[in-house]
């Protein structure tokens, strides 16, 4: 599934095509895995990293499980795949996506990144800090989601991004694009949701109590008590 990097000369070393998908993963579920595997195939990625956020400034803290539990659920869901679930944002000390991406680009110069988001996040993108700078850092792939696609195209973000949209049939060539560059991906809809899982099992995170985790990127151990009380 490795993508081909077209360089201008033999001295240009191929960088590893890597997707970045951020989120709370509260918890991670089969829908996350399905869209990620589809994106890996469509974009010819070597790997896709799940950036499990310590905390989303745009989401309420109520109902948010502790990071160790969310990361454990993500690592479990990513097994036997090119997906790597990481809590590297906690180690980087970043709160906003733009700061995380800047640090990842500097830390991993041998990787060529593409930011992956759902169409629902594209609707919210103008609320993100320095959102235009995110688009200037790396290409963006937007995954269509039922109920969001028409609104996503009409929102303020697309007023600026529309000029940078690339044809979907050229998606596998994203490593040749100079950002800003945006491509829309359409896969079979997946109705699974973290909200439904939490409603069916509000204490889902307790099954990860006491598990010690090693982050696949930082190699640091991440562990901590899983709160027994209200989340």
Which ranges hold each PLM region?
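Nucleotidyltransferase catalytic core that binds NTPs
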Residues: 1-231
């Amino acid at each position: 599934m490795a993508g081909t990097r077209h360089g201008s000369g033999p001295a240009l070393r191929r960088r590893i095509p890597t997707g970045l998908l951020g989120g709370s993963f509260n918890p991670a579920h089969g829908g996350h895995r399905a869209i990620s595997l589809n994106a890996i195939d469509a974009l010819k990625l070597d790997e896709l990293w799940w950036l499990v956020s310590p905390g989303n400034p745009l989401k309420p803290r109520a109902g948010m499980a502790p990071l160790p539990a969310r990361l454990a659920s993500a690592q479990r869901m990513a097994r036997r795949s090119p997906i790597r679930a990481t809590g590297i944002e906690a180690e980087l000390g970043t709160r906003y996506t733009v700061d995380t991406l800047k640090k990842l680009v500097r830390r991993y110069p041998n990787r060529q990144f593409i930011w992956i988001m759902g169409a629902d996040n594209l609707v919210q993108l103008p609320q993100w800090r320095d959102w235009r700078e995110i688009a200037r850092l790396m290409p963006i792939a937007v995954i269509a989601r039922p109920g969001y696609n028409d609104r996503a195209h009409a929102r303020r973000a697309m007023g600026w991004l529309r000029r940078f949209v690339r044809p979907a049939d050229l998606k596998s060539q994203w490593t040749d694009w100079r950002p800003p560059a945006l491509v829309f991906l359409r896969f079979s809809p997946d109705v699974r949701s973290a909200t439904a899982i939490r409603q069916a099992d509000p204490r889902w995170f307790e099954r990860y109590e006491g598990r010690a985790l090693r982050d696949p990127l930082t190699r640091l151990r991440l562990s901590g008590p899983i709160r027994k009380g209200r989340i």
